[in-house]
From Swiss-Prot:
GO terms for biological process: response to antibiotic. Residues 21-42 are annotated as: Disordered. The keyword Protease does not apply. Keywords: Antibiotic resistance, DNA-binding, Transcription, Transcription regulation. SMART domains: HTH_ARAC. This is Uncharacterized HTH-type transcriptional regulator in mcrB 3'region. InterPro entries: AraC_XylS_family_regulators, DUF6597, HTH_AraC, HTH_AraC-typ_CS. Residues 201-222, 248-271 bind DNA. GO terms for molecular function: DNA-binding transcription factor activity; sequence-specific DNA binding. It holds the Pfam family DUF6597.
Amino acid sequence: MRPCGSVCQHRHFRHAACGTQPLPWRTTAPEPGAPPHEHLSARRKIHSVSPEYEERTSRLPGAIGWVQGAPGCTGGGETTTVLPDGCIDLLWTAGRLLVSGPDTSAYSTHRGFWVGVRFSPGIAPALLGIPAHELRDQRVDLADLWPGAGTRRLTERVDGGGRTRPPPSRIWHCGVAADAEPVDPLLRAVVVSLEAGRSVTATADSVGLGARQLHRRSLAAFGYGPKTLARVLRMQRALRLARAGVPFAETATLAGFADQAHLARDVREMAGSSLSELVER
């Protein structure tokens, strides 16, 4: 895991109490035909999924809870690779609450016991009260975003004294600013358009924004400009196709790459591995 940065220590946000009504987490699979980014499957985020991994999809759009490992598990020094997917995660591990920002390249982190909530692109910044570009490529302690004793108390309540596995819903409530703004539906439209392979220009036109406006909104909501988000989503489309057994040449065409060589370059640059290596893991 990259060292946690110190981000926006001058900002102060109110916190939602951890004791509020828990979210309706469920362990059912997504509806057939649902867009891949709705489910936010861990196979997009973590491509080495252990038998101890459990996902909990939520009726709240754009969020999924997950647990990996068991209390006391240290991972034995093993690591797992996290790929860029445009998402932001709120994480709990070893008594710490962390925010994992949107990534532009793959990184390795230790296994062990993790509990988290993953938010699809554009969801978390409004809930956390922090622009996504300030979290890009970082793993940040929640206390650095929300300074003060309140964050420490919230962490202790999520931890539960170390006796039990903290549910994702408890982490959710401890990581949402009480004055959080509602998520702009325009952001969802941007993601859907780019996920479908539309160009940045066509996407901007479809939501009624100019190129500069879209870029500015994208930095705050997704952590990077629309071209980078489109590139990340395109790589994820290719991974889903390749893992489903689609030949690489056909995968390149269906995912929106110019050719198979273009696909290979993009995957190597963002994931640090070849497409065949990712599929085999």
